[in-house]
Amino acid sequence: MNIAQVAKQFGLTAATLRYYERVGLIPPVKRKDSGIRDYDEEDIKWIEFIKCMRNAGLSIEALIEYTTLFTEGDRTVEARKNILADERQRLIEKRKEIDETIKRLDTKIKDYDGKLRENEAKLKSRPKTESLHGSVEQRR
């Protein structure tokens, strides 16, 4: 696949794919004799992995380190596992923060629901002749 096809498949730009390769987020992509990148199935798997990890909030630095270690072979399995475990823990902590924020928002929304119900009850309890501008007699 060429860069335009891969970019379209993943909703990325060609510039982003070039950047991923340049900074080491993905291993170097093979090229045709003409110099055009020729993405194979392994490259596609790397892009899927990087996109998934970036969407989850992993830092570019952590992913570059992971990719670098991967290219060094099986002797780096433990280090790669540690990177992923550290990032997983960071995401768990982030999820806790998000859950707490959602709880606070839910509380505030309930508070506002209560205020809205109070205001509606006040409006319904007013005499029919009274409006926001006073009673009909007061306006004459």
Swiss-Prot record:
Induction of expression: By aldehyde stress, positively regulates its own expression.
All copies of domain HTH merR-type, residue ranges: 1-69
Protein name per Swiss-Prot or TrEMBL: HTH-type transcriptional regulator AdhR
Species this protein is from: Bacillus subtilis (strain 168)
Entry keyword Cytoplasm: no
PANTHER family (UniProt xref): HTH-TYPE TRANSCRIPTIONAL REGULATOR ADHR (PTHR30204:SF98), REDOX-CYCLING DRUG-SENSING TRANSCRIPTIONAL ACTIVATOR SOXR (PTHR30204)
Keywords: Activator, Coiled coil, DNA-binding, Stress response, Transcription, Transcription regulation
Region (Disordered): 120-140
Pfam families: MerR_1 (PF13411)
Function in brief: Transcriptional regulator involved in the response to aldehyde stress. Binds to the promoter region of the adhA-yraA operon, the yraC and its own promoter region; binding is unchanged in the presence of aldehydes.
GO biological process, one term: regulation of DNA-templated transcription
Highest taxon of source: Bacteria
Phenotype when the gene is knocked out: Loss of expression of the adhA-yraA operon in response to formaldehyde and methylgloxal.
DNA-binding residue intervals: 3-22
Result when mutating C52A: Required to activate transcription of the adhA-yraA operon
